[in-house]
Amino acid sequence: MALHDENVVWHSHPVTVQQRELHHGHRGVVLWFTGLSGSGKSTVAGALEEALHKLGVSTYLLDGDNVRHGLCSDLGFSDADRKENIRRVGEVANLMVEAGLVVLTAFISPHRAERQMVRERVGEGRFIEVFVDTPLAICEARDPKGLYKKARAGELRNFTGIDSVYEAPESAEIHLNGEQLVTNLVQQLLDLLRQNDIIRS
């Protein structure tokens, strides 16, 4: 908060997070999907949201491309803008967790420091880092948006995995093999959510 905002105060809500969670029938949590472009983050997150929806779980999916059409439309891809992009998404995700939702976020989020920033904002026990680990060669072969081709041709600068670093998680809550079938990965995630009493068995 800026120094000139000392008169802005926090207002507590009469309905607590616990009451909202009781209403939904499950805990609020963020599943933070991270990995290279083309690793399968959005695909797996979308499939998991569909599975959770069928189970009656209240969810919301925040996708890296989609938020840049609105919430983060003023940001580019410099290190500073990428950090601000993740900060904003983290704040939105935190609000949704406080509303009792299971929030799925699919962002490359290449730097450990930014992912840690969101973890600390949301709070331990409510942040699940999901590392979708897919070899660069596989991601590049998939290249659904043609971005790797542009990066290799020098038409796209600061592209993660090519000329911009990706810092892989060192202790993610779950490490997924991005070459496996999506259905297998979704089942692994559902098992994790049940084991941690986030959703009912």
From Swiss-Prot:
Keywords: ATP-binding, Kinase, Nucleotide-binding, Phosphoprotein, Transferase
A biological-process GO annotation: sulfate assimilation
GO MF annotations in UniProt: adenylylsulfate kinase activity; ATP binding; identical protein binding
Pathway: Sulfur metabolism; hydrogen sulfide biosynthesis; sulfite from sulfate: step 2/3
Residues binding ATP, per UniProt: 35-42
Active site: 109
Catalytic activity: adenosine 5'-phosphosulfate + ATP = 3'-phosphoadenylyl sulfate + ADP + H(+)
Enzyme Commission identifier(s): 2.7.1.25
Domain of life where this protein originates: Bacteria
Record HAMAP family: Adenylyl_sulf_kinase (MF_00065)
Alphabetical list of PANTHER family matching this protein: ADENYLYL-SULFATE KINASE 1, CHLOROPLASTIC, BIFUNCTIONAL 3'-PHOSPHOADENOSINE 5'-PHOSPHOSULFATE SYNTHASE
Function: Catalyzes the synthesis of activated sulfate.
Family stated for the protein in its record: Belongs to the APS kinase family.
Protein name: Adenylyl-sulfate kinase
